[in-house]
Amino acid sequence: MSNGIFIVGTDTDIGKTFVTGGILYLLRKNGVNASYFKAALSGAIKVNERLIPGDTKFVSDLSGLNEEYSFLTPYVFETAVSPHLASKIENIPINLEVIKSSYLKVKEKYDYIVAEGSGGIVCPMVHNEKSTILLEDIIKLLDLDTLLVASAGLGSINHTVLTVKYIENAGLNIKGIIVNGYDENNICHRDNVKMIKKLTSKDIIALIPRIKDNNNHKEIKKVFDDLDYKKIKKCIGA
């Protein structure tokens, strides 16, 4: 496997970008020459006729990564739908060779890559008459292990166990699970963590509390500073 990790979520809006940014912040703070990569992003915001990929901007700002967004994210779409559909609507075909070459350029410059997926593991990236490419195929293309981000709330046991089984059946390796939005005082959250660990046999490497304001970088950094950095670093092989 290449020197990096691919962050996957049990669903869209589960906290992948938040966790990705936090992990990259920790790595860079502790002297690791690490970067971000996201193959395709939908739902970008247009500012002065320029599309700004929100996830890429958030991760870069939080971690102190200073790169052109296009270097980190080769495909950026304004339409807020799955990449395969945004690609079709905007008439911009997604080319796997472009994704691979873009990733390799980032890899040449940095020692470790924290890559982020789009949506969940079965998110379609390309769909045409010739083929259907899912997020799992992008992970295989980049030859990376995965780290799964799951919710702490109701329904998480089912979503997480199914995602783990799917990832394993796809022949991919899961290094661990991060539970996002966790409240120690919530009996459901505590039991979810216990059952997820039992049913998946995967290490839960971090329990991250809910953040009131995702734009408060000072608060976010404190949350990640309070985590067990050595455990995270060892888990992802950074």
UniProtKB/Swiss-Prot annotation:
It is found in: Cytoplasm. Its EC number is 6.3.3.3. Its main location: cytoplasm. GO terms for biological process: biotin biosynthetic process. Pfam families: AAA_26. ATP binds at residues 13-18, 55, 116-119, 209-211, 216. CDD domains: DTBS (cd03109). Substrate binds at S42. Its cofactor is Mg(2+). It catalyses: (7R,8S)-7,8-diammoniononanoate + CO2 + ATP = (4R,5S)-dethiobiotin + ADP + phosphate + 3 H(+). SUPFAM superfamilies: P-loop containing nucleoside triphosphate hydrolases. GO terms for molecular function: ATP binding; dethiobiotin synthase activity; magnesium ion binding. Pathway: Cofactor biosynthesis; biotin biosynthesis; biotin from 7,8-diaminononanoate: step 1/2. One of its GO terms (cellular component) is cytosol. Keywords: ATP-binding, Biotin biosynthesis, Cytoplasm, Ligase, Magnesium, Metal-binding, Nucleotide-binding. Homodimer. Belongs to the dethiobiotin synthetase family. This is ATP-dependent dethiobiotin synthetase BioD.
